[in-house]
Amino acid sequence: MNIVILAAGTGKRMRSALPKVLHPLAGRPLLSHVIATARTLQPSRLVVVVGHGAEQVQAAVAAPDVQFAVQAEQLGTGHAVRQALPLLDPAQPTLVLYGDVPLTRASTLRRLVDAARDGSYGILTVTLDDPTGYGRIVRDAAGFVTRIVEQKDASPEQLKIAEINTGIIITPTGQLAMWLGALKNENAQGEYYLTDVVELAIEAGFDVVTSQPDDEWETLGVNSKAQLAELERIHQRNVADALLVDGVTLADPARVDVRGTLRCGRDVSIDVNCVFEGNVTLADNVTIGPNCVIRNASVGTGTRIDAFTHIDGAELGANTVIGPYARLRPGAQLADEAHVGNFVEVKNAVIGHGSKANHLTYIGDADIGARVNIGAGTITCNYDGANKFRTVIEDDVFVGSDTQLVAPVRVGRGVTIAAGTTIWKDVAEGVLALNEKTQTAKSGYVRPVKKKS
């Protein structure tokens, strides 16, 4: 089977310099959703017709299995499909999809393909409570499709028809080439409409079969930011419903956003206003507090992530405790039972089993052993303005508050570092490390007093 995806439109109503099909839905371009669905049908040829912003669109979705045809002039959907013909296998049927209709299920498309498997011309239709503005499916007394009539051309009787054309079709490719060549642009827009092909198919004696989706939102397209927002909510609610079916507890299904893939174990709980991006895995009994952002991360069994925590590119072991207001950046690896508390930032660092950095700390480019306590205000000084260096803290080290570790530096097992110490040399095992300081008290000091105005 050939699949052609039309993605050449300008999208004027989006009021954006970004091509319409590249506007994001759940963190991915609209067109990427359509391509992903198309791939599940295993087409022999997958062709995307580009036009407005062609180079930008091609760069965004380029892949070995995707070919591109260019519609240099926007002369209608029929003209767009015509540009793809040289790239198609004429011996295989062609399914036509739209780059701005992202939510059509693969199962819906398979039903349409199956309905037209005998070489018929197939149309995906949908029945709407309010079909205003759409082309109506006109049938004869026996129920066979005779034509598609646009709203402006419909008679009062035809306007009562609730079944409308979605634009998604499957057709024999050899005949499609002939029908496209016979299209005329005798309309107000001067365009060649793909919908006109159905009458040519009927005139040629082809059966026209139809199929419908399970839900009408599967056929909704995007022509404005309002419609994009509507589809985003539909998609996110579908994702939330699937999570609920899988046993995930959502404090409010309307207030969780998944912009990628979220895999959850048993008894996972997610509070409100959480965003998941990229590939995220939550193991059994994970609890996520409100207002967290988690991107490309794996979270171990029994972990608790408190409110306002940001996690990006991190790996968390079992029974870790993170936040609130913590930030784990790419390369952060936390072993089982590690704690990273409020206003702690970890980047490209390993924190060992049971180690804790509970508040106000920066840990970057570091290897921290097991059972280490990092006091408040500790900083690994890892950057000299040009190069990054690592800090190594071995097992059972106690780091006092307001400590600076100037990398590259190693702190041996069992060391105690006094509060307010700057470490710039390696420290041997088991010692107390401190900077000698003298505390002085002076009598007779008078504090300055502000003058009254």
From Swiss-Prot:
It catalyses: alpha-D-glucosamine 1-phosphate + acetyl-CoA = N-acetyl-alpha-D-glucosamine 1-phosphate + CoA + H(+); N-acetyl-alpha-D-glucosamine 1-phosphate + UTP + H(+) = UDP-N-acetyl-alpha-D-glucosamine + diphosphate. Its cofactor is Mg(2+). UDP-N-acetyl-alpha-D-glucosamine binds at residues 6-9, 20, 71, 76-77, 98-100, 135, 150, 165, 223, 329, 347, 362, 373. It comes from the Bacteria. CDD domains: GT2_GlmU_N_bac, LbH_GlmU_C. Pathway: Nucleotide-sugar biosynthesis; UDP-N-acetyl-alpha-D-glucosamine biosynthesis; N-acetyl-alpha-D-glucosamine 1-phosphate from alpha-D-glucosamine 6-phosphate (route II): step 2/2; Nucleotide-sugar biosynthesis; UDP-N-acetyl-alpha-D-glucosamine biosynthesis; UDP-N-acetyl-alpha-D-glucosamine from N-acetyl-alpha-D-glucosamine 1-phosphate: step 1/1; Bacterial outer membrane biogenesis; LPS lipid A biosynthesis. Its main location: cytoplasm. Residues 1-225 are annotated as: Pyrophosphorylase. Residues 226-246 are annotated as: Linker. HAMAP family: GlmU (MF_01631). Homotrimer. This is Bifunctional protein GlmU. The gene is glmU.
